[in-house]
């Protein structure tokens, strides 16, 4: 580490203020918090900030449904979010809201600077308009029949059934998802940010070598497809900030949302003496700026955000650290299975430090998805934290307290072993710095194994029974306690609460510099249990509680929908059985068992996945519009059913040689047909 402390500003992506924090959100906040705590442990100055993303049509409409104002709703959500983050020991220096005066002023300033510098233009566009609610409709608030495959009840930007992308004006029989009314076309002036003007700068920033390779590669794809002007305005009614100098025009939520990073920091500066906003945000700042985000919002953070900052005279981020999604037990989080776990539900049943440790043990610097396997979670935390690390203290502390009045030996008996533990500091530091937390944990647990091996070989419980060996006993146990101290110093960024209890036990603060020399002749306190093992019954209770939460949420949603429609509809009401056909017509359809050899996303297609299918001696390529329901890696190797004699169809992205069968209403609620084991590729389905 450099002699002069670094000055860092670190952010997490802003949670949207219309729902609860869940364990997927917590991955990012735990990852960032571990990195921040490591930096602080090394003496660097860190300002760690976040805020709620509190604008947009969904918030406005949800507040209306609840019968409260948007301001009331986002205030309640903010309180809930902050309580959840505090429960997981996320050490934010400030948590704010994008619906703040600081954000209004900064967003307006950035917009006016962009406009002054020639990066804002306007033109008239035609949009669908809800005549009952008197509002323009975002794409996702229009539903109708797909113009391509004629599937009903599809969103206004793409079809969940066939994967076709289109504008909402192309829908057949479009309806407003807000009121059910038939929308009409209406012209409106919109404002655009000229992103293409920043292409050279963005390419240079991409090639700087600081971005993750996956992010840089994705940006290169976007450059090759051509950057487009970005619509930054929305029409009233809209919950957000009005555009300066314009009437009934509001900033699109994604313009003022990232400005929320600046606004939260400005709010912190205004209440912290000596903290200078300009020092961190001026164009030539020597401070460091890092954003932790999920892979679903890379586009906004790697293109629009740095371009907005460049165009308005502010500094750009040093890096954008991107992580993958969280799965549970190998599948996407499911409300019906109870694996869609809210942060608050987890905190009622389990120690947050367990999740912090497990996430750390599986995190790396790549954009990989992380699977929370609940059985492995239990075994790893109990084996590593309880059996290896905490047990190291408990098996030595009793002798020190009972036989030596809590005092460690004056002489340290194993300097070479201790130096081996201290020598690992540089390796572990580099792994923390580069966000290779999983490798850091492996280094730490390997040291824990060595420490326990030492205690096993010295067997203090045997020495304690032998006459005249008090000094040897004290020295053995003092070595064990000191090795535990080093391990807990390394673990302090991951498990701050356990570290605090350890500091109380050792009667000394854990510092990175402090481990250079062992504690000798030092008095420790009487040992108390530092950490409890995970009881599988608590995990079962958490899953059941999550199911109950989901059921209650669904019941409330269904009740609201029923009241809105005055009658609930069955699946057959929504999708009636087709007219009868003759058996010969059905027999003409050749359905076969297929094994999914490979599955991948289709660039520039919002809903399509591309499959290579083995149908028993022949491989078929098929495109299917189920991307919103599955990740490609979830499907590879599975058996499914396909229509094999469907005439090949040439699509924009290639030839589709059949159709995969799936059931469900669409969106994320789609399920491919999966035959039982025993069925083989190529078998006919009768």
Curated annotation (Swiss-Prot):
Cofactor note (record): Binds 1 zinc ion per subunit.
Keywords: Aminoacyl-tRNA synthetase, ATP-binding, Cytoplasm, Ligase, Metal-binding, Nucleotide-binding, Protein biosynthesis, RNA-binding, tRNA-binding, Zinc
tRNA-binding domain mapped to chain residues: 585-686
Sequence motif: 'HIGH' region, positions: 15-25
GO biological process: methionyl-tRNA aminoacylation
Oligomeric and partner information: Homodimer.
Function: Is required not only for elongation of protein synthesis but also for the initiation of all mRNA translation through initiator tRNA(fMet) aminoacylation.
Protein name: Methionine--tRNA ligase
Species of origin: Vibrio campbellii (strain ATCC BAA-1116)
């Amino acid at each position: 580490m450099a002699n002069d402390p670094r000055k860092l500003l670190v952010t997490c992506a802003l949670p949207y203020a219309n729902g609860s924090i869940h364990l997927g959100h917590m991955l990012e906040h735990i990852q960032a918090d571990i990195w921040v705590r490591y930096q602080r442990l090394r003496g660097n100055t860190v300002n760690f900030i976040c805020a709620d993303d509190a604008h947009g049509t969904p918030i406005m409409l949800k507040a209306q449904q609840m019968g409260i104002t948007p301001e009331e709703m986002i205030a309640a959500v903010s309180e809930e979010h902050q309580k959840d983050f505090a429960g997981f020991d996320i050490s934010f220096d400030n948590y704010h809201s994008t619906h703040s005066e600081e954000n209004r002023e900064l967003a307006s300033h950035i917009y006016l600077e962009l406009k002054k510098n020639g990066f804002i233009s306007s033109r008239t566009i035609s949009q669908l308009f809800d005549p009952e609610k008197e509002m323009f409709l975002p794409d996702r608030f229009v539903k109708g029949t797909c113009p391509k495959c004629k599937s009903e009840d599809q969103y206004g930007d793409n079809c969940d059934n066939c994967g076709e992308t289109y504008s909402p004006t192309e829908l057949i029989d479009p309806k407003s998802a807000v009121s059910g009314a038939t929308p009409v076309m209406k012209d409106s002036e919109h404002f655009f940010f000229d992103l293409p003007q920043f292409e050279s700068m963005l390419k240079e920033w991409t090639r700087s070598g600081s971005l993750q390779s996956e992010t840089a590669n994705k940006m290169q794809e976007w450059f090759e497809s051509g950057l487009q002007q970005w619509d930054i305005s929305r029409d009233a009614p809209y919950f957000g900030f009005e555009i300066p100098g314009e009437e009934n025009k509001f900033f699109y939520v994604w313009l003022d949302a990232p400005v929320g990073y600046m606004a939260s920091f400005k709010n912190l500066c205004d209440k912290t003496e000596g903290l200078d906003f300009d020092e961190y945000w001026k164009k030539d700042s020597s401070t460091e700026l890092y954003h932790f985000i999920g892979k679903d919002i890379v586009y906004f953070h790697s293109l629009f955000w740095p371009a907005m900052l460049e165009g308005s005279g502010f500094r750009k981020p040093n890096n954008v650290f991107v992580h993958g999604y969280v799965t549970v037990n190998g599948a996407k989080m499911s409300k019906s299975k109870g694996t869609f776990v809210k942060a608050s539900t987890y905190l009622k049943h389990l120690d947050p430090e367990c999740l912090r440790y497990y996430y750390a043990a599986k995190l790396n610097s790549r954009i990989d998805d992380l699977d929370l396997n609940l059985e492995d979670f239990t075994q790893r935390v109990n084996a590593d934290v309880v059996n290896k690390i905490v047990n190291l203290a408990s098996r030595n502390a009793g002798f020190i307290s009972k036989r030596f009045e809590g005092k460690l030996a004056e002489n340290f008996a194993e300097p070479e072993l201790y130096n081996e533990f201290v020598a690992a500091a540089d390796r572990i530091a580099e792994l923390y710095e580069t966000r290779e937390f999983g490798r850091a944990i492996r280094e730490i647990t390997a040291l824990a194994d060595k420490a326990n091996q030492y205690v096993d070989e010295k067997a203090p419980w045997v020495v304690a029974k032998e006459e005249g060996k008090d000094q040897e006993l004290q020295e053995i146990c003092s070595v064990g306690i000191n090795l535990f101290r080093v391990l807990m110093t390394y673990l302090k960024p991951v498990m701050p609460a356990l570290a605090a209890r350890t500091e109380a036990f050792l009667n000394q603060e854990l510092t990175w510099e402090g481990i250079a020399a062992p504690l000798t002749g030092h008095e420790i306190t009487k040992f108390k249990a530092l950490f409890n093992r995970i009881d599988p019954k608590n995990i079962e209770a958490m899953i059941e509680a999550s199911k109950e939460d989901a059921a209650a949420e669904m019941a409330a949603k269904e009740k609201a929908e029923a009241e809105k429609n005055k009658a609930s509809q069955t699946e057959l009401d929504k999708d009636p059985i087709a007219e009868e056909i003759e058996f010969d017509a059905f027999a003409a359809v050749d359905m076969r068992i297929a094994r999914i050899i490979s599955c991948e996303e289709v660039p520039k297609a919002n809903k399509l996945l591309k499959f290579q299918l083995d149908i028993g001696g022949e491989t078929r390529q098929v495109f299917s519009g189920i991307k919103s329901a599955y990740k490609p890696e979830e499907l590879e190797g599975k058996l499914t059913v396909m229509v094999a004699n469907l005439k090949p169809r040439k699509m924009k992205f290639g030839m589709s040689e059949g159709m995969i069968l799936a059931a469900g209403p669409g969106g994320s609620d789609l399920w491919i047909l999966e035959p039982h084991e025993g069925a083989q590729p190529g078998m006919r389905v009768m």
